[in-house]
């Protein structure tokens, strides 16, 4: 699927903006002049005195009932629009897996009423603009970038893409061929295998796995009529949230948006419920047969939590110390810095809004050292569950999160997109106002408590993508073997076209 890209003019502006922000957002360290600390853990942060903007200052209700977040930015002669759409591949029928993605692609690349796809491309190119459509698991996003002087014409094109796609059959046939070719190659990259098999192990037949369940049969079954029905179901004004920034006057852009949506029929959206609870998977060691590689991808974890749990801030700090904080985190130090086993390692709590996410730790290494590296991670998980962290370590982790609170508000465009996303996901209006205070309140006792509450060594699932024979042999330098961690199940690599 074609992703949003900024034209040459936009890239120049973006680069200048990025460089300026890089200077503005460098953390202010409290160290004596000329003093160089011997380790990042010893960096001291000055108090950040920053008050995030409030969503109510950017929010507007359009005539049709849709919400728009807008910010004037006369310094840059551009217009940027994002339209969030409450939809996603989680809501498509399993037997039509791939429908949401193909609908989004054809909205942009299958022509619109009165224009072929080539004619639409030409008009957008003449404006030095860009329009993209992307429908992923839990949302759709339609984006526009153009010069502000071309706003009227560009918004008219955006309206055509949103309201009047024709889903040209020839374009559908071409894209279907591309998708089938992509499926044929889905086992070539071990990253794809790892992600897919992790979803299946963790979630079984939960709707969140549908994006990974495209098959030759499901893709071939998708018709133009399916796309028309999918578009009609989800693309209507009250199901949109707008994020708009650029060189305009507020009253003018609101009038343009109202005009764009006028006369467009609405209806009530009936989203299929997404189960928020999932059963815990069976603990054990699962080895996916991929014998033509010389390294293993290793992931271990279990079912975790949703986004808005009461102790989310302590959880952020705890995982930052464990494996989410880059080179200062314990897993990265042990696996990469101390032992040199992997270039990339870490841990993360994925925290979706609609259902429980997962805790996962990961690294990639030679087959022989996989069990040794896994044991190092287990040691760190046990350590953070049983030993209270030093207050200084906790304070440094907190300071990092607090200093980054400016990032969602670094430009006018990021401000409105942050608030549109928060609106879409139901985040409280005062979330950012209270963010720093809530992070500051986290104590070493809180870190220990959430580690004990949300890390479950007895529920761990171990996923290894690599050559099972080589992985199980291990290393003569280390005694650890994957059989130490649970019962081993060898899982044949799925057929890329059928997933059987």
Model feature map: region roles:
Residues 33-49, 241-243, 392-500:
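C-terminal regions of mature proteins
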Residues 89, 299-303, 323-365:
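A structural supersecondary motif
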Residues 35-44, 204, 208, 212, ...:
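An aromatic/glycine/proline-enriched structural segment found at the starts
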Residues 34-41, 111, 154, 186-237, ...:
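Scaffold signal of the M16-like zinc-metallopeptidase fold and its non-catalytic homologs
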Residues 14-27:
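Bacterial N-terminal signal peptides
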Residues 109-115, 145-176, 325-326, 350-408, ...:
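M16/insulysin-pitrilysin zinc metalloprotease superfamily fold
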Residues 178-197, 276-296, 333-342, 387-438, ...:
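Short acidic/His-enriched helical or mixed secondary-structure segments at domain edges of catalytic enzymes
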Residues 80-145, 210-212, 326-341, 353:
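M16/MPP (pitrilysin/insulinase) zinc-metallopeptidase core fold and M16-derived inactive scaffolds
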